């Protein structure tokens, strides 16, 4: 269909699609919205009444890490409010440490609200596909991955 462009898989490509390819509506992250606003593009965003999908990244430590003390120090550093605020400002995310929402020069005191802090209850978090689930409607990861590639390819 001529109004269907593509399913984006790269946030910067999505920004370019809005800027240069005539895309006028899409699902996105705050990163794209903030980038388009910074580039003076006519853009706005909304979380629908039904909610939106999203995710929370994690940092994991391998059980047999060669230098676990170093890894723990990095994890501790990454949870610092300044670091969390800076990353949230750059990526358009909400920090894992709520204290990062205030007093960060990059994020500003309105950054968490801009990036959706108050919409947390409207987010339906992504889950890893499961082959077996209580509803019997789940698909294995391999099928999900194949279908995802097909969607990205427009099939």
Where do the model's predicted regions map?
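Extracytoplasmic/cell-surface-exposed regions of Actinobacterial cell-envelope-associated
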Residues: 1, 16, 77, 91, ...
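Sec/Tat-exported extracytoplasmic proteins
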Residues: 1-2, 8, 22, 37-40, ...
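Ligand-binding pocket segment of bilobal, Venus flytrap-like solute-binding proteins
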Residues: 1-48
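Extracytoplasmic/periplasmic, Sec-exported soluble proteins
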Residues: 6-10, 53, 62-67, 136, ...
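Tryptophan-centered motif/residue detector
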Residues: 8, 29, 55, 144-148
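Non-transmembrane alpha-helical segments in soluble domains
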Residues: 15, 19, 27, 72-79, ...
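Mature extracytoplasmic/periplasmic domains
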Residues: 53, 57-124
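Conserved C-terminal helix/tail region of periplasmic/extracytoplasmic solute-binding proteins
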Residues: 122-155
């Amino acid at each position: 269909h001529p109004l269907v462009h593509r399913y984006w898989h790269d946030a910067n490509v999505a920004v370019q699609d809005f800027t240069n390819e005539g895309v006028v509506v899409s699902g996105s992250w705050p990163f794209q919205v903030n980038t388009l606003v910074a580039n003076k593009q006519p853009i706005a965003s909304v979380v629908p009444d039904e909610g939106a999908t999203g995710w929370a990244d994690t940092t994991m430590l391998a059980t047999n890490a060669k230098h676990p003390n170093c890894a723990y120090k990095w994890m501790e550093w990454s949870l610092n409010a300044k670091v969390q605020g800076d990353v949230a400002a750059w990526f358009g995310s909400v920090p894992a440490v709520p204290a990062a929402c205030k007093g960060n020069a990059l994020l500003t005191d309105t950054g968490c609200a801009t990036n959706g802090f108050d919409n947390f209850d409207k987010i339906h978090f992504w889950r890893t596909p499961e082959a077996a689930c209580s509803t019997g409607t789940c698909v294995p990861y391999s099928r999900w991955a194949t279908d995802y590639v097909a969607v990205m390819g427009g099939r």
